[in-house]
Amino acid sequence: ERTFRRKKDAEELSCGFEVIEKLTEKFKAKAQKPVNFIISLQTKTAYADNDYLGEVLSNLIDNAIKYSKESVEISISSEESERYTILKVRDNGLGISEADQKVIFQKYERAATAKRSRKNGASGFGLGLNFVDQVIKAHEGRIFVNSTEGEFTEFTIYLPLETPNNRHNR
């Protein structure tokens, strides 16, 4: 079992959310259907590895588009609590069943929605959300999913403002 590690030392981590703008442009350009992004950022940075956070968001956006209805709406928001930067990615897609929500971050797991979408050209091995989970854990954060089948899926990421490795810098 390989453990995921961040590429950079904790002191070097500060991710500006410009990465979100780049990703939304990229996905709008390559999507096979209309995609509308609603961006609402109360906080502009996260204590995270820029490259890896970009990969996490890319993964979540890609899934939102893959497993969506004809017209895709994705909202990305950020806020800060006392201890965390909270990042949310929500879509108006096909949703994920309660049973699948319990296992969705496990390696090689694919939601029933994903299996059904294979007929529509969605591909992959079920590694994406496991990777997302590993990255967030490597940043001492947490990720949760909330979804209603046929309506929406929302991923909420909590990234600590302070970790044991960066306390002395604040």
What are these model-derived regions, one by one?
Residues 2-9, 41, 45-48:
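Conserved micro-motifs of the catalytic ATP-binding
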Residues 91:
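Acidic ATP/Mg2+-coordinating residue in the GHKL
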Residues 109-122:
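Glycine-rich ATP-lid/hinge loop adjacent to the conserved G-boxes
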Residues 128, 132:
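Short alpha-helical Gxxx[C/S/T] motif in the catalytic ATP-binding
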Residues 140-141:
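Conserved glycine-rich
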Residues 96-109:
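Short conserved segment of the HATPase_c
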Residues 64-65:
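Short helix-loop "hinge" at the ATP-lid/N-box region of the Bergerat-fold HATPase_c
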